[in-house]
Amino acid sequence: VPSTRALIHAPWSASKVSTALRCPRLFYFKYVEKIAEPEPMPEARIGKAIHVALEHALQGTPPTEAAAKARAVLTDEHEQARFDTLTVGVGPFTERINKFRRQRRVQRQVVEFALAVREDLTSTAFYAGDAYYRGIIDVAYLYDQQHLAIVDHKTGVRLPPVMMRDQLDGYLVLSAAWWRSARTFWLGIHWVASRAVEWSPPVTLAEISDRMAPNLLDNIEAAALAVDDGPRTNPGPWCDRCAYRKLCPASQERWEPVDYDDDED
């Protein structure tokens, strides 16, 4: 049974949990005070545009046309140049997906699919009042009636999958609740910059229910506890990339140099 403090801040998501654990002040800016990002990071704008291009391409829009539609929201020349470099791989990726669909008996494709579960991990609507944890899957394919392949697009620097374990496990917990016929799950990380898809070993339904689901609930409780004493700051290396840094009290702190006496070593 979730704690009251966890229920207060529901619905949770992977990014919401990680934000609470990293910096309670940022959590309050985003999820309690609901202040819009005053200074979105360039990589966030580029990543969002790339996701839009991939979404359109996977739904049948020609890759060049999909890229042009997504590029229209970017006004900075440097961001446009970075976007153009990344979208070179959109066409080859959709070709790989089409090849996969021809080789497998795909019953269903979903793109940018929003899922949610209740506190007992049964499925519910994304915006439902009883949603406890939720997420959006970039693309997934149900094939051969009992296999589900999930692909998550990443536009940043390629990282070891273990660094995204909580987010990826959350997708599996959500998917297991929504696709009841699935028995085996495959997770692929699409590294857009390197034009590669890195697949995890197959995950069984038993592994999701026995290990991943309890870990997810534990992480939510840890996040709720981290923000329970209010919006305290937690300065760290992430501050330089924070969109709220100009609003944060920690950015106003000044450290004075220490004066030593001449006769001290």
Residue ranges: model-predicted function:
Residues 23, 50-51, 135-157, 170-171, ...:
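Conserved catalytic cores of phosphodiester-cleaving nucleases, focusing on short active-site segments
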Residues 14-62, 110-113, 244:
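Nuclease catalytic cores
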Residues 98-103, 129-132, 138-145:
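A short acidic-Thr-Gly-centered motif at the start of a beta-strand
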Residues 11-12, 94, 118-123, 129, ...:
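Metal-dependent nuclease catalytic regions and adjoining charged, substrate-binding loops involved
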Residues 107-113, 131-137, 235:
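Short beta-strand or tight-loop elements
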